[in-house]
């Protein structure tokens, strides 16, 4: 195994072990320090996050409509490795995964009944704002962050033959420095953010499955149950990781889409169908109409509303950035053979539509119960809001078990994808990292999630991941500069070659 791994593996293991040890020995101390640091960053650099993430969206749109969009992520005659449906399924599963199920009902309810962006809860305007801001937080901006990182990795790896490392994308502007300490530091930030972000999500996934089992069957909401769940899921995702990308992750992602589609369709039919579709349509219009205002909204003279923006919008932008090395590298790996335009439209548009539909169905179903006084969904914990909502619609047990299976499969695909990406990043960018390396990362992630659930340090570790987003956002800006420089150069070369290949019209001598 040792010959397959780079020094980044050992450096990140040491840093992660130190963070986990701190979380075990003194979780309150880690929580206080990380929370204070996070508060300082959101207060002092909130404007920066809003500007850079909006820049990411703008750059993606520019590339879609630019002639550069015709360039293929691979050799000119290369075909996509995965079919369109499997590709969409893997994008969706890796990009949002557990978060969609965790917050499907919880975020709209929170914006509507607990803490509204407008300040007034449980009003008709709060209802509209709830869905609009949920779309905003999970929409174009989130996927643009992923798309930028994925595009840079895919272009330099499949078009230029560079290793599949974050640092390799900066070679046009940093030169040989990417092979030295600077490159190692960049890769360490990316790997650390991935390990911490995914471990946190695994912990949240275990708590939601446990919350669902407790709500449905009265199984105790306790660490020992969560530990058993983590062990079971770990065995399953390690088996999937061992089987390879083309089998395990692909089949699980396709299964995810089928299960999610069945649950969505059922709830659309038995829920407040007309209200759901009206809200879906209205909220898309509201989202498009207000996207610029929401993208730059800081309310500097209104501390209460600014606190809401810090807690939601800026938190989300930092969280998506901290996840972008993992999701971006995975998306790049499964996108070989597509043009830049096809890639960006696929990554930005399709997941957004599915995400908006998901939140409309489950969010509106929950908010409808709340506004009619049929059930106080807002009183439930975040991890049980989905189950509380399902409890008030037909076939409760069937839909709840389906939701539990969906969470478990998302759990497995997220961890499986992460072990693959971590294996790549610590094996010199290998497209097929050794199983021993993937298994090592799988065990490390699960152990971290279990230890921090036990010590109560999971929230503190989540804050730590978000802190890594600030330096990594600067890395993404450098990646954009590097990519644009390379794409512009290649575009000039293509135009020059086209001119040389263009047949000259024969000269006709004039008769005098």
Curated annotation (Swiss-Prot):
Subcellular location: Cell membrane
Top-level taxon: Bacteria
Record-linked InterPro entries: BCCT_CS, BCCT_transptr
Membrane-related topology note: Multi-pass membrane protein
Transmembrane portions of the chain: 5-25, 45-65, 82-102, 135-155, 186-206, 222-242, 257-277, 312-332, 343-363, 395-415, 441-461, 464-484
Location (main, coarse): membrane
Gene Ontology molecular functions: transmembrane transporter activity
Keywords for the protein's UniProt record, in alphabetical order: Cell membrane, Membrane, Transmembrane, Transmembrane helix, Transport
Nuclease listed as a keyword: no
Activity regulation info: Activity is stimulated by high osmolarity.
Induction entry: Induced by high osmolarity.
GO CC annotation: plasma membrane
Pfam families (UniProt xref): BCCT
GO biological process: glycine betaine transport
Entry-linked NCBIfam families: bcct (TIGR00842)
Function (record text): High-affinity uptake of glycine betaine. Does not mediate either carnitine or choline uptake.
Family, per entry: Belongs to the BCCT transporter (TC 2.A.15) family.
Protein name, UniProt field: Glycine betaine transporter OpuD
Upper classification of the organism: Bacteria, Bacillati, Bacillota, Bacilli, Bacillales
